[in-house]
Structures are given as structure tokens and as C-alpha cells.
Design a protein with these regions (language model features):
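Juxtamembrane intracellular "pre-TM" segments in multi-pass secondary transporters
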Residues: 2-16, 201-234
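Helix-loop boundary and gating motifs at the non-cytosolic
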Residues: 4-64, 228-269
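Hydrophobic core of transmembrane alpha-helices in multi-pass small-molecule transporters
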Residues: 27, 95, 106-122, 237, ...
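Helix-to-loop junctions at the C-terminal end of transmembrane segments
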Residues: 68-80, 165, 279-292, 376-377
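Structural signature of the two symmetry-related core transmembrane helices
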Residues: 83-98, 294-309
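Cytoplasmic helix-loop-helix junction between adjacent transmembrane helices
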Residues: 113-150
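A membrane-interface helix-boundary motif in multi-pass transporters
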Residues: 166-187, 376-396
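C-terminal membrane-cytosol helix-exit motif in multi-pass small-molecule transporters
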Residues: 186-206, 402-407
């Protein structure tokens, strides 16, 4: 255990100030988003609106992110990561504040769409920023640590979201309590501006002026690299379809199936994120044993039994345990995938590569959000959620096997 901590401590000391500031920025933004994620669906229900509205808001948010990710990635490559992140954080914070106070269904949909647009600017620039400020040998550890810290910050946000809402409810109505919590979440998100403002970007070194059209240049100069981006995109689309059926509605699942309180829901989701953070540290160890591709696949496949346990159990305790392990195992491979992708593309198009990868994932959420709510409404609370979780397990299985077949052969070709 001492060797384990020493390894991570040694790694962290090698990171420059830009990386540490980026981590702080993501801590603040993830606390804010964690508070929103755990409570916002319930806010919509508290306004007296239906499950369909929740589905529409989630679909519009994801669709907006999918639409803007590639343009945001190109902007990040051409204008600089820091400028794009500052723009995204300030506007996202303001939009989140508006979402905390508006009640009209139309405004809920508009602000949900705007959230998807502006949060993408931070989202699309973070991984390329870390890649450009690190060495290849640092990246598996760095991306795992970054993801773990982000997840831990999300845990804090989820816990705050649940407990603050119940605390405020002691003094005011449920609706007002939720609204106060959401406003605090938006303030946390805006705090990310301050570490970003302190970052120092050397664009002359990282983003040469002669790189005018990264997308066309990349196709001409590195067709095999473009192939890698497309292959990653297909894998992410399959996982995104499965994720979009389940993940946006986990708070409603625990509320509807088990009548859990806001505090209990916040605690469960927070524990799931905490388990994910711990699993992130295990990722590099698995990579050393079996390689990057197999590590991703093994972690994803190991999550499936726990997903099905969550789907069919009638016990809140077992559902929570299944959720914790599914969450940890399924997400532990994400930083490994990011490291693998960043290692295969040029600096001038890292933002574009990352944006395409995230875009297709968001498309999965956009398309499957309304499908999920329709299935639950058609089959009822128990069988509706059970069917949704089962479909997700099937899509995860297909996505994992595809990743293994495609990238194992690609990795073998690279080694040759």
C-alpha cells in the first residue's frame, strides 16, 4: 500500500502548475454540476411537470452538447484552450443560475439547451489541455488522477445537493429548498473561473499559426489517425446509447422504485461516485497487467452483473450495492480510453478528436432519454426500469466486445 501511495505522490509532483490549476477548475465545476445532477430532475417534478419534460430537458441538453462539441473543439484548437474554457465557465455559470429560478416549461427547455452548449467548452478543452501540459508516460496516471478528483468533487456536490435540500426544507417549502441548493451549485460552478484565469498558455509552441484548418490537415497528414477517431466514435456511440437510457434517471429510479428521500438519493449517488474515484486509481495497475485495450474491456464487462442486479432487485440495499459497483467498474476505463486516444493524434487536433468522441456519446443521451421515459411509462415502475437497465446491459456488452475486437487488432498492427 505504501508503494502504491508513493507511486501516485511521485507522479503528482511531476505535474506543472497548469495541470494543477486545471484540476482545481474541474473540482469547482464538478461540485456545482454534482449538486445539479442529484436534484434538478426532482426540481422539475416539484414544479408539477411530468416525466416527459425531464426526458425532453435531458435530451435537449445532450443534443446541444453534441451539436456544439465539434465546433467547440475546433475553436479550442484555433483560439486556445484557456480562452475557450473561460468563455464556457462564465456563461455556463450564468445559465445554471437561470435554471435555478425559472419555472415555465419553455424556459426550462431553453436553459437546458443552453447548458449543453456552454458546458461543452470546458468539457472539450480539459483533456487536450492536460495532454499538452504532460508527457506521454505521465498520461495514464494523470488522466486517472484527474478523473478520480473530478469524480470525488462530484461526490461532494451530490452530497451537498441532497443534504442541503433537506436542511433548507426544515425552514421553507420543498420547492424553495431545491431552488436554494441549485443557486449554490451555480455559484460553485462560476468559481472555476479563477484557477482558469491563472493558467498560462504557450500557444506559439502548442498551436502553430500555420495550422489553419486542423480537420483537413489531419486527414491529409494522418489518415490512420483519423481512422482511430472514427473507431473510437463508434465505440462511444454504443456506450452512449446504453448510458442515456439509465444514467440521467438514476435519482428518479431510487425515488420511484424505493421512495428514497433526497438525502438518501444524494448519499447513494455520492457513494457511487466515490467508488468510481477509487476505481480510477486501480486503472493504471490493470493497464500494467493486461494493456490499455483489455483493461478497458475487462472493467466494462465486470460491471454488467451489477447493472442487472440493480435492475431486478426489490431491495434498496442491493440496488445501491449494484449501482456502486457498476458505476465504479464502468467508469474506471474512461481515463484509459482518453490516454489511448490522445496518444494517437497530433496536438493541433486534440480538441477536435476529444470533441468528436464526446459528441457521439452525447448523441446517445439525446436519442435515448425520451426512449427511457417512454418505456418506464409504458411498463410501470418495476418492469419499466428493469427493461431499461437490461437494454443498457446489452448495449454495453456489444460496445465492449466491439472495442476489444477493433482496438486489439489495431494495437497489434501498431506494434508490428
Amino acid at each position: 500500500m505504501g508503494v502504491f501511495f508513493q507511486e501516485w505522490s511521485t507522479q503528482f509532483k511531476t505535474y506543472n502548475q497548469n495541470i494543477k490549476l486545471a484540476i482545481w477548475a474541474n473540482i469547482f465545476s464538478q461540485i456545482g454540476m454534482g449538486m445539479f445532477m442529484v436534484i434538478y430532475n426532482i426540481y422539475i417534478q416539484e414544479l408539477g411537470l411530468s416525466h416527459e419534460v425531464n426526458g425532453q430537458v435531458i435530451a435537449l441538453t445532450s443534443l446541444a452538447t453534441a451539436i456544439i462539441l465539434v465546433p467547440a473543439g475546433i475553436m479550442s484548437d484555433k483560439l486556445g484552450r484557456k480562452r475557450v474554457m473561460v468563455f464556457g465557465v462564465l456563461l455556463s455559470g450564468m445559465i445554471l443560475f437561470l435554471r435555478s429560478i425559472v419555472e415555465m416549461q419553455t424556459l426550462l427547455l431553453i436553459t437546458g439547451f443552453a447548458t449543453g452548449i456552454f458546458t461543452a467548452f470546458l468539457q472539450v478543452s480539459s483533456i487536450p489541455w492536460l495532454a499538452e501540459n504532460s508527457k506521454p508516460k505521465q498520461r495514464v496516471h494523470l488522466f486517472s488522477l484527474h478523473s478520480a478528483i473530478m469524480t470525488a468533487a462530484n461526490v461532494i456536490g451530490s452530497l451537498l445537493g441532497g443534504f442541503l435540500t433537506d436542511f433548507f426544507h426544515l425552514f421553507t417549502t420543498e420547492l424553495s429548498a431545491i431552488r436554494f441548493t441549485l443557486i449554490i451549485g451555480s455559484i460553485f460552478y462560476i468559481l472555476a473561473f479563477f484557477p482558469i484565469a491563472k493558467m498560462v498558455e504557450n500557444r506559439k509552441e502548442k498551436l502553430p499559426k500555420n495550422k489553419k484548418i486542423p480537420f483537413r490537415e489531419f486527414i491529409r497528414a494522418n489518415k490512420s489517425g483519423f481512422k482511430v477517431i472514427i473507431l473510437f466514435a463508434v465505440a462511444q456511440l454504443l456506450i452512449g446509447f446504453g448510458s442515456g437510457l439509465v444514467i440521467p434517471y438514476l435519482n428518479l429510479y431510487f425515488a420511484d422504485r424505493f421512495l428514497a428521500s433526497n438525502s438518501i438519493i444524494g448519499l447513494i449517488i455520492s457513494l457511487g461516485q466515490a467508488a468510481t474515484a477509487v476505481a480510477m486509481f486501480i486503472g493504471p495497475l490493470v493497464v500494467r497487467k493486461v494493456g490499455e485495450v483489455r483493461a478497458v474491456v475487462y472493467l466494462q464487462l465486470a460491471s454488467l452483473p451489477f447493472l442487472l442486479l440493480t435492475a431486478y432487485t426489490e431491495s434498496l440495499l442491493l440496488a445501491s450495492i449494484g449501482f456502486l459497483f457498476r458505476q465504479a467498474l464502468m467508469n474506471a476505463g474512461n481515463p484509459i480510453q482518453s490516454s489511448l486516444m490522445m496518444s494517437k493524434v497530433n496536438d493541433s487536433v486534440k480538441g477536435l478528436a476529444n470533441s468528436i468522441n464526446q459528441m457521439v456519446f452525447q448523441l446517445g443521451w439525446a436519442f435515448m432519454g425520451p426512449v427511457s421515459t417512454a418505456i418506464v411509462l409504458k411498463y410501470g415502475t418495476y418492469w419499466g426500469y428493469a427493461n431499461v437497465f437490461t437494454i443498457t446491459a446489452g448495449l454495453y456488452l456489444i460496445g465492449s466486445l466491439y472495442f476489444l475486437i477493433v482496438f486489439r487488432s489495431l494495437q497489434s498492427t501498431d506494434e508490428e
